[in-house]
From Swiss-Prot:
Superkingdom: Viruses
Protein name: Uncharacterized 8.8 kDa protein in frd-Gp32 intergenic region
InterPro entries, sorted: Phage_T4_Frd3
Matches recorded under Pfam families: Phage_FRD3 (PF05798)
């Protein structure tokens, strides 16, 4: 199992994406941030979590930013 701790703005959207496209992943922690975001922890198989991060979370980011966020995945 792998996990990643990320900040998001729209919890309902990310929750729906995970439920519909990545059912093997689960959100295991949700916390409001001091800033205009929500901190979540997503866990699941490494391959599925990597695919979620690349195709959903990092989509449209500069390559340097995407590389940073992909590096947050823990095994």
């Amino acid at each position: 199992m792998a996990k990643v701790d990320i900040d998001i703005v729209d919890f309902e959207y990310i929750e729906e994406i995970i439920r519909n496209r990545y059912p093997e992943l689960s959100i295991t922690s949700v916390q409001d941030s001091k800033f205009w975001s929500i901190q979540i922890v997503v866990e699941g198989p490494l391959e599925d979590l990597t695919r979620f991060m690349a195709n959903e979370y990092c989509d449209g980011m500069d390559s340097e930013d995407a590389e940073f966020y992909m590096g947050l995945i823990e095994q």
